[in-house]
Every structure is written in structure tokens, then in C-alpha cells.
């Protein structure tokens, strides 16, 4: 689809995830102007210079610069990757207290600029912090999006593709719920090239035992990567890039993001990972993918987990 002209993206937080996202943006050429905001001014300026030197080989012209919160006033999209890092052995939800304070100050500064675009949140715990950004900013719910389970879904599709020796693009299935320990796989709706996974397993019963392993490996992938190299950033950066392109190119594509529920799935007042249609206005619509009884129960528990975390801050 045609790219809207005058696209401006602001990145807040130029750490491992943020800088990986910036590099992905340069390689995919989805915006015209890219601004980096970070407390470490020298690194942000250095990255802007480094990225600009690669523009000549990028698919489209893009201006990259270091900036301040004043640059947010005419941005189409602000991507927040700032916050305290997740440490080995620490769950995403352990981070909430530290990052809530950081986010309040960031969002206040952004809104002072007159910003009225779309927020895309990546910092963990992403569902709770996306909820916080909507509350802090006062923007309409459709204009505040979290990365949600977009990476979990990608991991899920990758692992299934490896097991069945097909392209991940031919694997269709979702991880929904909290981006964290209470997430769940929608096994009942998973298919490979239109063939129900349940039907495939009936024909290949020897693979049945591998299914739970695939989910566990999907859910716990971040912990394994953090143990090995200290942080995850390439995968989530690509997920952020996919959401960004859906917004900037007005794609109306379905992605599993953290979206606000208002009665969908029988729940409300929570941001959580669900399939949603994404376009230039942000979240056009939350889609209610069919769930079986067990999946509904697990999803309800995931909602409870997130509400228990956010309630002390927004009761």
C-alpha cells in the first residue's frame, strides 16, 4: 500500500531494543524522518550519525537526527523503548514499579509538545505500561498500542514451522494474553496452510507430545535468551517494525498487539495481547478469535494477572 508522505517517527529510549528498531527502520525505509531521544545524548547523536551514513544504501531517503521532546509535536508515531532493563531471573511484572515512574515523566514531556499521534510501547511489562500511557496521556484508546504478544506469536510460528518443516508464513496461530508467564496459545485456531493443527496431530500422534514443549519454549524463550546474552532485542525490534509499517502504511492488517478491551472476550479495562486490525489510526478494531473453554479460562486468568498489577496504581 502507498506510504503516507510526511511520516515522522520518534524513538524514546536508544538502548539495545531502541537502536535495533532504528536499524530495522533504516533498512525498511518506512518513514521520512526519524528522531532519537535518549538520556545518553552522546550515544543518541552517535547513532544518528552512524545511521545517516547508511541512508545511501537504504530503500528510501530518511533523515535521522538526535532530538528532544519538542520534536514530538508533529510526529505520526512515537515508539517508547525506554525504561529499566529486565535482569536475569526477574519477570516482566517485577519491573512495573520502576518503569511506571519513568513513563509518567516521559509521557508528561511528550504531551506538553502537543503530540496527537500514535504511541507504540515496547517496555516491559508492556501490557501494564501501555495501559499507563493511555491514562497518563489522555489520548483515545486506539492511539495507544503495546507490542503485546507480537513477538510471542512470531516465536510460536517459528517453532511450529521448524517442527513441521514449512515456512513460518504458512503457519497461522496466535499467542494471546499477557506478554509474559500467563500467556496462552490458541491451539484450537492454529492451522498450517489451512489444515487444522488438531487434524494434523490426529494423523501424526507421535508429534502430540511436542506441542506442549513448543508452547513452553515459546513462553520461556526470553528467559533463555537473557541468560545467554543479557537481553532480547532483535526479535522485538522486528515486531515493532512490523507494527510501525502497518500504522504508517495504513495496512489494515491483523497483528497480535496489546489493545484495550471494552467487552471483547468478556473483559474490559485492561490492555492485553489480542489480534487487532492495525492502520493509520492505530487500532481499528479488536478481533475476537474463537476460544475453547480451556482457552477462555486461561485468558481470564491472564486478565486477572494484569489487573492485579495495575490496580494499585490506577484504583
From Swiss-Prot:
The enzyme class is oxidoreductase
BP GO terms, sorted: glycolytic process; lactate metabolic process
Q: Which residues bind beta-D-fructose 1,6-bisphosphate?
A: 157, 172
Q: What pathway does the annotation place this protein in? A: Fermentation; pyruvate fermentation to lactate; (S)-lactate from pyruvate: step 1/1
Task: Give residues annotated as binding substrate.
Answer: 86, 92, 124-127, 152-155, 232
Give residue numbers for the modification (Phosphotyrosine).
223
Which GO molecular-function terms appear in the entry? L-lactate dehydrogenase activity
Binding residue positions for NAD(+): 17, 38, 43, 69, 83-84, 105, 122-124, 147
Q: Which GO cellular component term is one of those annotated?
A: cytoplasm
> Where is it chiefly localized?
cytoplasm
State the oligomer form and interacting partners.
Answer: Homotetramer.
**What is the protein name for this chain?**
L-lactate dehydrogenase
